[in-house]
Every structure is written in C-alpha cells, then in structure tokens.
Amino acid sequence: MDHVKLVNDPIDIAHIHQLLADEGCGASSVFVGTTRDNFQGKKVVSLAYEAYDSMALKEMNKICSDLRSKWPDLKHIVIYHRLGTVPVCEASVVIAASSPHRSEALESVSFAIDQLKTRVPIWKKEIYEGDYDSEWKENKESIRPKKSQSAFNYAACPCKVEESHDVPRTLVQIRVNDAELTKRLECFVNRKRDEINSQNVIDFKSSFVNSDKDFSDSCARTQSTIIKQEQSNSHLKVRRVNNRCGPQQMEMRPNYELELNKLMGSRDGQTDPSKEMRKSLPNSRLQAIESYMCLTTDNEENIFSRIKKVENRLLQLESISPEYRHFTKLEPSSMEPPPPKKIRKKSYSAQELSAFIQKIKDGSEFT
C-alpha cells in the first residue's frame, strides 16, 4: 500500500514503522532527512519548506508507481514530507519501504529519495542565526534547462561606443532650463485643476445667488445637488427616450407621406441654376441633382459615372433615412390585380331623371 502525505506537524517515526508492518515482509528500510545546524560556517536555525501541493502529491504518487514497476515485491511504501518551519534535528522528509528481502527495500528507498529531490516541486529556505539573510536553496539533483552552447558571449567582444551629448538644435522642441520647464509643468497642472474644479461647481453645486447664507467654504461633497442613482455607476440621471414623433415612426402616422410631399413640394423652384449649368440641359439638370444630394461636381467626368454616384447616394439615403421613401414609387407586381380606377359618377337633376323615365315608358330608348 502507498502512503503519500504532506504534513505541517512533526513526523512520528513510530507511526511510520506501523505503516510498514507486514507479516510477509522480512526487511524494512527507512530514510529520515533532518535539519542540520550549519552550512558553510553559518549557524542554521531552521528550514522553511514550501510546495505546490497538488503537483507535489501527484509526483510522489508517480514515484511510488515507478518503485513498484522496478521492484514488484514491495509491500508498503511511505513518503512523508514536512512543510513550514522545521527546527534543527527534526525530520523534514521520511521515505520507507518494506519487502520480503532487504535488497529491494534498500535500493527502492535510495531511488525514491533521488527522484523526490529531482521531480517533486518542494522548495527549501535556510534561516541563519545573526545578521545573515535567509537563502533559498536548490537541489543539486533538480532538473534545470541546459544553457545554450551557441549563446553569444558579449564579454569576449567589447564594443567601444563614443558617447556624445551634443544633440542638433533642430531636434529640440523646448529650449529652456530645468527650472523653467518645471514651472511650465506646474502651471499646466494648476490650470487643468482649476478647470476641473470650475466644471465640478457647475455640474454638482447649486447656485446660492439669492440665498442669504454664506457658502464660501462649501464644496461638492457637502452641498451636492446630484445624488447617485440606484443600480447606476453615474451620478447624473439617465433616462431612456421613447421617440414617438420622428422619421422612424412614419408607419404610425397615416398622413405623414402627404404632409412630407407638401413640404418637399414647397421647395420646388427655389434653386437658381448658374450660367454654367445652363450650357446644356442634361448637364444642368444633373448638376442640380448633384448639388441637392451634396455630391462633388466634375463636368469633365463621364455622365454615366456621375449618374451612378447619384444612384448610390439615393440608395444610401433610403437605407438610413425613411423620409426619402416618398421619392420612390414602387410599381405593382404583375401577380397582383391592378387597383380599381376611381370613376366620378355623374349627377342628374330631377328634370333629367323625369325625362329619362318618360323615354323608357314611351319605349323610345329601345327603338
């Protein structure tokens, strides 16, 4: 059975032996890693361990699987690692294995500790006594990416660069000293601050011109007239406008097209074509249309391309402004019956009706 765990409390070695106990095992190998009290002449007080818990446990379980694939006779495997602060002489890691024979137990534990130092993401920091700063230590067995052999050695190729502080005057926009530049920046910041303050007074403070109270020391925080709206990030009140009268509502107005036709018809004849437009009738009429459509006029351009521009402009206006629908008269579909023609009925007087009835009686209409 595999026992893998990251603990924050001291590791109980007796409990480890209980986990290894098995009637079919004749050997148990236990490795205990402890904190030593010195490193390169410096007094070590304790070690601090940190780990990426989920990945560390995953790698420790993989190590157990590798051990069982190499030594199938192993019965129990224990890998305990401590996290947090570990004082001197206390156990930081315990790796143990039990098997029927001693060779498998000894070799598996040695292999497991090497793999633990190499693969498991656990970091160690040594805390020293005195004025020495604590240091993070890396395992010599850890996998590190090898440095590229083709990396360029800049130290072997010194480059001499001539430093020149002379800048052409054509590249300098502001030719003042530091004091003058600082003064200009301060003036700019103060002016912008005054503009913001004055705008805040206009937006947030009410006018007290007719009030007898003295509000010379008031501010927008204490005398604000605008309150933040609920469920809104803005202090200004926002309303949704329902435009009931406008170009988009023309279908709801029965007399809209009639009124618009009258309005547009009143503008006919107001344009006064110039002398150049009167040179030729087609050119003058086309220029009048281009002028009305706000299109650029070029007399040297082909007339067909100019007509094409006018058509494109009309299509654009029809797509964005429904007011231009009154210019278009859609022809009825051939499948639909033509609308009935309006015939004005003739009005007859009483004398005409009497004469018509008398003719019917006399039979003069049928002769």
Swiss-Prot record:
GO biological processes: chromatin remodeling; Mo-molybdopterin cofactor biosynthetic process
Enzyme class: transferase
Keywords associated with the record: Cytoplasm, Molybdenum cofactor biosynthesis, Transferase
Pfam family for this entry, one: MoaE
Signal peptide positions (record): none
Family (UniProt): Belongs to the MoaE family. MOCS2B subfamily.
Protein name per Swiss-Prot or TrEMBL: Molybdopterin synthase catalytic subunit
